Amino acid sequence: MPKRRRGEKKTTYFDYNLLFIIIFLLCFGLVMLYSSSSYTSANKYGDSAHYLKLQARNIAIGLVFMFYFAKKDYHVWRKFGRLAYWGALGFCLVVLAKVPGLTRSSHGQSRWIQVGPIGFQPSELAKIAIIIYLAMLIERIPKQLDKVSSMAKVGIRLVPLVLFVAVNNLSTAIIILGIAVCMLFVASPKYKEFFVVAVLGVLFIFAFINIASYRSDRVEAWKHPETAGDKGYQTMQALYAIGSGKLFGKGLGQSLQKLGNVPEAQNDMIFSIICEELGLFGAVCVILLFVLMLWRMMVIANNAKDLYGALLVTGIMSHIAIQVVLNIAVVTNTIPNTGVILPFIS
């Protein structure tokens, strides 16, 4: 929000179209979360609405913060760029060190920091931190980004955080790299340099896949899920769910695959249940909602008062877009399993 002169009437700009899309996706997400998780939740916790209640609580907290920060001048985040970056880096180090009493494991990986009832993944914090930090850096040297050396200096500053995240969570590291590339491209759209960056990014991903054997196993399971045993089971069941939904689906709440067949149906595989219950028609509608959301964000970025505001929106837009594409690509077995959730719905 720009500063106003003395005597000027304060004006705020609020995109109600974007707000409506967000609220609709959140409400739709609650419905689908309950539908996909009620069976598992009842068996595990004795309460079919356990996951629904947790999600509703988190949404309520998120909406409070959203409306609070929507009234604030976004330039205030510029002051926290370095703090956000170094804070995220520090939390990632805590997870890597597996500090007793501060970290907990999930699905065999130590990715969480747990302090009493409060738990979070530093890798998720790193996504937001990189947006705030990179927007601050780029705004200070926009014209210098035409030089390859200046772009390389910015990229080098991101390397420690990306590497620390990639050790335990390669998919999130890929998302962070994608966000950074999109923000740099908006600031300096030089195609040759970004082709080089893309090649280096592919080499980075290839190297990390081969470092850990379980990542190589995921690639093999992706190529031949039908013969991969337990490693390909989730993918095969998700594909069965998608195929059985046909054009208009079996009907809301009528999924059979959610009855213990699709592991983590309420998490990264929820799109397969959407396809089964609402069919291809429902899946396309969900994708169109995300497209509309990204379009509204692009409009906001184009009309931002300054480069910093445009970069913040670009970073958030890139984050959501990359995560949606990765999630749907995993569910449809277009790429190996990454564990990336579907924003606003999972």
Spans of model-derived segments:
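N-terminal Lys/Arg-rich, disordered targeting/topogenic segments
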Residues: M1-R6
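TM-adjacent membrane-interface loops and short helices in multi-pass inner/ER membrane proteins
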Residues: A221, P225-N267, F271, L278-G282
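Short linear Ser/Thr-Pro motifs
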Residues: S35-S38, S255, S346
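Extracellular/periplasmic helix-loop-helix junctions in multi-pass membrane proteins
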Residues: V331-I345
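N-terminal membrane topogenic signal
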Residues: G7-I22
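Hydrophobic alpha-helical transmembrane segments of multi-pass inner membrane proteins, especially
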Residues: I23-C27, S35, Y45-Q234, S272-N333
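Alpha-helical transmembrane segments of multi-pass integral membrane proteins
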Residues: C27-G29, G243-S244
